[in-house]
C-alpha cells in the first residue's frame, strides 16, 4: 500500500445518518470536512482575492486542468513554481482532470477511443487530444494537492450498454493514470466512480477503483441533468461501496439541499461554480431562500441582504445598494454578491459540521429547508 500524500482522519460519525465529521491532511495544510470548495477555474475564484477566500473560511479551492492547460499552459505554471506560488494561495488546491470540459466539447462519440479523446478548443477551435497520461502530466506540472483521474462522464440518461462500456474504459484509464503519476509523495490522486443511475455499474466501478489504492474517491456523473431524488438514490448505494478511511468527493454539486443530503449520505467534499455564477446575475442565497436582487421590490429596501448572515456584504451594505450596483453592471456589485454566496455555502457547511457534532443533522436539515423554501409546493431548486 502506498503512503499517500493525502490522509483522511475521521473525528465522529453522526448517530442518525451516514454523515461524518473529519479532516483531510494535505501538503499545504489541513481542512475540516464536510467542506464546500469554491471553484477557481482559471487559477482565480471569479472577483475574489485569495485573502478574501481565507477570511470567509474556504480551506481548499478547486482549479481546472483543461483551462489552465490551454491558458497560460501547465509548463508556465510549473516554471512559476506551481499553482500555489503562481496564484499566491498557500492552502490546499484540488484540480479536476479536464474530462468534464472535454466531453462538453466532443462533437462525435467516435472521438472517444481507448487511447483518449479528440476535441476542439473552446478558445480557437484547434483540434486537441487528451488522454489519462496527459491529464496526469498536466496536473503534476500544476502541483495541486489533490488530483483527479481522467474519466469519461456520460450524461445520466444513456443506454445501459453505453454506460457499461464507459465504466470499463474509465477503470482502464484510471489504472493508466495511476501508473503515469510522477509525484505520489506530494500529490494525492483520486479515482472517479461512474455508472450513471445503474447500481450494478456503480458497484463495478467502485470495485475496480478501490482495488487500485487511490488516495481518495470521487463520485462523478451526477448533477448532469438527473433529479434531486435520483441523485440521492445513487448516493444511497454508492457511498457505502467506498472505503471509510479515505475522502469521498461529490463532484459539481452546490445547491444547499444537495450539499446537506450528500453529507447525510457520507460525502466529505463538494464543489460547484454555482455561488459565483448566479451572483453575476444578481441571484443570492439567503437563509430565507433565494433573492433576485434585480427585482424592483428591492429598489427602496435599505435592510441587509440576509439578517442571519454576518458576512462583509450583509454587515455593510443594503439590498437597495446591491440592486443599484448589479443594475449598473458595477464590478463591486459582482464582488459583493460573489462574496456573500461563497460565505453562505462555506458557512452552511460549518453549521452542518456543528450539527454532526451535536447528532441533530436531520433536525438541522428540516429547519434549514423549511426556512429556505424547499418544502413549499412551489419551491424552486437552483
UniProtKB/Swiss-Prot annotation:
Family label: Belongs to the queuine tRNA-ribosyltransferase family.
Residues the record lists as binding substrate: 96-100, 151, 194, 221
Keywords: Glycosyltransferase, Metal-binding, Queuosine biosynthesis, Transferase, tRNA processing, Zinc
Known partners and oligomeric status: Homodimer. Within each dimer, one monomer is responsible for RNA recognition and catalysis, while the other monomer binds to the replacement base PreQ1.
Reaction equation(s) it catalyzes: 7-aminomethyl-7-carbaguanine + guanosine(34) in tRNA = 7-aminomethyl-7-carbaguanosine(34) in tRNA + guanine
GO MF terms held by the record: metal ion binding; tRNA-guanosine(34) queuine transglycosylase activity
The protein's name: Queuine tRNA-ribosyltransferase
GO CC terms of this entry: cytosol
